[in-house]
Amino acid sequence: MARIAGINVPDNKHAVIALTAIYGVGRTRSQQILAATGIAEDTKIGSLSEDKLDALRDAVSKFAVEGDLRREVSMNIKRLMDLGCFRGLRHRRSLPLRGQRTKTNARTRKGPRKPIKK
């Protein structure tokens, strides 16, 4: 298994799919990285030389991925909550942010139903 950005990338998959195992790298960004490094999308990661793997590591390191990206997202949410804006309040109350109805739906976000006390 090749290690890129601290993640074990599967050797037996095509490069375009294998790179999506890294948090923050989807299909489009994976295609961009492979085009920049000159690696064909249907090449298996296990068959790449060490030089090509180093080029992939350098290309991936130019983007915010894994821990840095997770930290950035959580800091953005924390900032919204500290500001007290509408989205921050919805995060704080664990409710949907984007205008969905909550009278009957939103069970995933709100959690299981709470019984009515008599």
Swiss-Prot record:
Superkingdom per UniProt: Bacteria
UniProtKB keywords: Ribonucleoprotein, Ribosomal protein, RNA-binding, rRNA-binding, tRNA-binding
Chain residue ranges for the region called Disordered: 94-118
Coiled-coil ranges (or none): none
Gene Ontology molecular function: any one: rRNA binding
PROSITE patterns per record: RIBOSOMAL_S13_1, RIBOSOMAL_S13_2
An example Gene Ontology CC term for this record: cytosol
GO biological process, one term: translation
Gene3D superfamilies hit by this protein: 1.10.8.50, 30s ribosomal protein s13, domain 2
Signal peptide interval: none
Family: Belongs to the universal ribosomal protein uS13 family.
Description of how the protein assembles with itself and partners: Part of the 30S ribosomal subunit. Forms a loose heterodimer with protein S19. Forms two bridges to the 50S subunit in the 70S ribosome.
Functional description taken from the UniProt entry: Located at the top of the head of the 30S subunit, it contacts several helices of the 16S rRNA. In the 70S ribosome it contacts the 23S rRNA (bridge B1a) and protein L5 of the 50S subunit (bridge B1b), connecting the 2 subunits; these bridges are implicated in subunit movement. Contacts the tRNAs in the A and P-sites.
NCBIfam families linked: uS13_bact
Name of the protein: Small ribosomal subunit protein uS13
Gene: rpsM
